[in-house]
């Protein structure tokens, strides 16, 4: 991970070194906490030094929430600006699109909660059909698509999220693809506690949701989808992160890490 901190000067905020790791998510949570009660303000945010392109998804969700009551201006260092123009994120903030000739971006998208078919087509065409992914059978690809679609459906089924945000990036030097799916709903903790009549903390709720057979939908099998996804990622030396409320979960090389955001 990198060093993440905010430079505060009035309503102008600079965010440095945002990786897609615990520290990076903590920095975005801190940004949200700073402004969540702001109303009718002009807020300028500067992205500096480094910004993982797939973090456009959580940042986009935060900026949309802040933008309902404030005027948001987003700026970025030139190297960051270029990639975020290529993936389409900055098109939502007044910047022209830039052609991605290297085909390393997976477009930033904002799906309405009823756009299941469009989301499935996007994941299939933009993510699962990428040549950098490992070879797998059509049936395996279909199962992975179903698992990712289930994440979308669960977010819209359980929460009042208005949009689902997605974005990804291929890194040729590391030979890896980072992909993020974000919603702005009530979170896993509230969903699980409502289902069980419990008072679990966010990390405990995430743990519960990861167990085979556990589901928050009546009469619907659950848990299996995330298990299948984790097995696929482990086999291909990938990792899975889940961030919900103040809980953080990461499974990398079958090593499971739980942490709590401040």
Segments and roles (model prediction):
Residues 86-106:
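A glycine-rich helix N-cap at a beta->alpha junction
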Residues 17-93:
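Amphipathic alpha-helical interaction surfaces in cytosolic regulatory modules
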Residues 60-65, 136-173, 226-233:
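Conserved ATP-binding N-box helix of the HATPase_c
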Residues 183:
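Acidic ATP/Mg2+-coordinating residue in the GHKL
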Residues 50-53, 125-149:
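Conserved short strand/loop->alpha-helix "switch" segment adjacent to the catalytic nucleotide/phosphoryl-transfer site
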Residues 186:
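Glycine-rich G1-box
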Residues 106-136, 189, 196-212, 231:
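Helix-loop-beta hinge of the Bergerat
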């Amino acid at each position: 991970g990198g060093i993440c901190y905010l430079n505060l000067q009035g309503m102008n905020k600079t965010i440095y070194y945002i990786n897609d790791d615990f520290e990076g998510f903590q920095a975005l949570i801190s940004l949200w906490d700073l402004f969540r009660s702001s109303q009718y303000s002009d807020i300028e945010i500067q992205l500096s030094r480094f910004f993982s392109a797939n973090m456009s998804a959580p940042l986009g969700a935060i900026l949309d929430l802040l933008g309902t009551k404030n005027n948001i201006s987003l700026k970025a260092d030139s190297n960051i600006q270029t990639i975020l123009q290529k993936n389409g994120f900055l098109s939502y903030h007044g910047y022209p699109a830039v052609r991605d000739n290297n085909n390393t971006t997976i477009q930033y998208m904002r799906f309405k909660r009823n756009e299941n078919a469009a989301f499935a087509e996007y994941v299939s065409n933009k993510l699962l059909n990428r040549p950098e992914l490992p070879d797998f059978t059509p049936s395996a690809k279909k199962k992975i698509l179903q698992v990712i679609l289930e994440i979308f459906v669960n977010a819209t089924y359980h929460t009042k999220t208005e949009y689902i945000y997605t974005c990804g990036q291929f890194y040729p030097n590391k030979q890896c693809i980072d992909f993020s799916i974000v919603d702005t709903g009530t979170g896993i903790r509230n969903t699980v506690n409502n289902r069980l009549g419990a008072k679990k903390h966010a990390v405990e709720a995430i743990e519960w949701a990861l167990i085979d057979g556990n589901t928050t939908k009546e009469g619907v099998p659950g848990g299996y989808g995330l298990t299948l996804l984790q097995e696929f990622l482990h086999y291909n030396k990938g990792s899975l992160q889940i961030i919900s409320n103040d809980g953080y979960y990461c499974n990398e090389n079958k090593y499971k890490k739980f942490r709590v955001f401040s």
